[in-house]
């Protein structure tokens, strides 16, 4: 197995759905199925914060979500927890700046997908040099889902990454909705990552379809 290509990674980032049980008011398994039917291209399991499952319950829930992703041939990524990602043989892991260092993560994960949250050009360059396959850049807009977020960067912050020569695939993170998706792609992102825009939507299926439409309308400006 070899590392994922930039072109394939870019395609997978189009509509990146992140969810845990506490991000939903309806059955999370059904929400994931509806989102997959609607066209999400990659899924991240993020079970943390108030009311999150722990221990065996968390692992069982992750396995259920992973099985659904497999049915649809969509990569299943684990947020922060490298050990869980290895235990589940997940397709990859996403880490933040406060989590396990990228060099150690790459050693453990082999050629699997690794995404890194970055807020500065220095963090981005370090992540790329040490094996990141994609960057999560944000928060682009204000968000209520994550309580420990950094300062809002806006689409200008995202565009700055491209202006400074950051050429690997980027997914925009934070406060992204159907209405502002186009501006995130225009600023240089390959795709958008969302939680509540799908998990709390009246119809996860319809919401996902609209996000897919917005991303494909703009098309990424990067040729890998």
Swiss-Prot record:
Its EC number is 2.5.1.3. 4-amino-2-methyl-5-(diphosphooxymethyl)pyrimidine binds at residues 44-48, 79, 117, 146. GO terms for molecular function: magnesium ion binding; thiamine-phosphate diphosphorylase activity. CDD domains: TMP_TenI. Mg(2+) binds at residues 80, 99. Signal peptide: none annotated. Binds 1 Mg(2+) ion per subunit. One of its GO terms (cellular component) is cytoplasm. Keywords: Magnesium, Metal-binding, Thiamine biosynthesis, Transferase. It holds the Pfam family TMP-TENI. Coiled coil: none annotated. It catalyses: 2-[(2R,5Z)-2-carboxy-4-methylthiazol-5(2H)-ylidene]ethyl phosphate + 4-amino-2-methyl-5-(diphosphooxymethyl)pyrimidine + 2 H(+) = thiamine phosphate + CO2 + diphosphate; 2-(2-carboxy-4-methylthiazol-5-yl)ethyl phosphate + 4-amino-2-methyl-5-(diphosphooxymethyl)pyrimidine + 2 H(+) = thiamine phosphate + CO2 + diphosphate; 4-methyl-5-(2-phosphooxyethyl)-thiazole + 4-amino-2-methyl-5-(diphosphooxymethyl)pyrimidine + H(+) = thiamine phosphate + diphosphate. One of its GO terms (biological process) is thiamine diphosphate biosynthetic process. Its cofactor is Mg(2+). InterPro entries: Aldolase_TIM, ThiamineP_synth_sf, ThiamineP_synth_TenI, TMP_synthase. Pathway: Cofactor biosynthesis; thiamine diphosphate biosynthesis; thiamine phosphate from 4-amino-2-methyl-5-diphosphomethylpyrimidine and 4-methyl-5-(2-phosphoethyl)-thiazole: step 1/1. It comes from the Bacteria. The keyword Heme does not apply. The keyword Metal-binding applies. 2-[(2R,5Z)-2-carboxy-4-methylthiazol-5(2H)-ylidene]ethyl phosphate binds at residues 143-145, 175, 195-196. Condenses 4-methyl-5-(beta-hydroxyethyl)thiazole monophosphate (THZ-P) and 2-methyl-4-amino-5-hydroxymethyl pyrimidine pyrophosphate (HMP-PP) to form thiamine monophosphate (TMP). Belongs to the thiamine-phosphate synthase family. This is Thiamine-phosphate synthase. It comes from Bacillus cereus (strain ATCC 10987 / NRS 248). The gene is thiE.
